[in-house]
């Protein structure tokens, strides 16, 4: 994986410079969508088929995107296809978002809850977490009933686990020690 990160870094940095000069949030959404499409197994098969020309691969990829694609994005996609790097887009997107977060003083927060959170609960939870972590958070929310109750939050390499499952595991360790 380190090798993929090394290869993807210059692409992410170049794309970030272009996005910063234009519409960073718009580019961020487009990069996320491109990464999602590039991660699809059919796109992988298409990109690695030697019988299909680069132009056809680029056109097919662009047509799979729902967002409008400007000239700069088309050039970026064409460059990735010509250099056989289209399937690197998920890693490029990860690094792009890390650069965006660093500039904004923000971080991605993965919030896993035992139950579905209402909009008000999520807003309150994010506000509390932003105070705790000292930066703006971009939350992604998932539900995992195995937590039994509470939430598990991952921000970068920090984990805050207030779930019932974690408490039970701590009690089990304490009792068996």
Swiss-Prot record:
Name under which the protein is recorded: ATP synthase subunit delta
GO CC terms: plasma membrane; proton-transporting ATP synthase complex
Assembly information from the UniProt record: F-type ATPases have 2 components, F(1) - the catalytic core - and F(0) - the membrane proton channel. F(1) has five subunits: alpha(3), beta(3), gamma(1), delta(1), epsilon(1). F(0) has three main subunits: a(1), b(2) and c(10-14). The alpha and beta chains form an alternating ring which encloses part of the gamma chain. F(1) is attached to F(0) by a central stalk formed by the gamma and epsilon chains, while a peripheral stalk is formed by the delta and b chains.
Gene Ontology molecular function: any one: proton-transporting ATP synthase activity, rotational mechanism
tRNA processing recorded as keyword: no
Keywords: ATP synthesis, Cell inner membrane, Cell membrane, CF(1), Hydrogen ion transport, Ion transport, Membrane, Transport
Alphabetized Pfam families for the sequence: OSCP
Organism: Herminiimonas arsenicoxydans
Database matches in HAMAP family: ATP_synth_delta_bact
Membrane topology recorded in Swiss-Prot or TrEMBL: Peripheral membrane protein
Function: F(1)F(0) ATP synthase produces ATP from ADP in the presence of a proton or sodium gradient. F-type ATPases consist of two structural domains, F(1) containing the extramembraneous catalytic core and F(0) containing the membrane proton channel, linked together by a central stalk and a peripheral stalk. During catalysis, ATP synthesis in the catalytic domain of F(1) is coupled via a rotary mechanism of the central stalk subunits to proton translocation.
Compartments, as annotated in UniProt: Cell inner membrane
Signal peptide range in chain numbering: none
Entry superkingdom: Bacteria
Similarity section: Belongs to the ATPase delta chain family.
InterPro entries: ATP_synth_OSCP/delta_N_sf, ATPase_OSCP/dsu
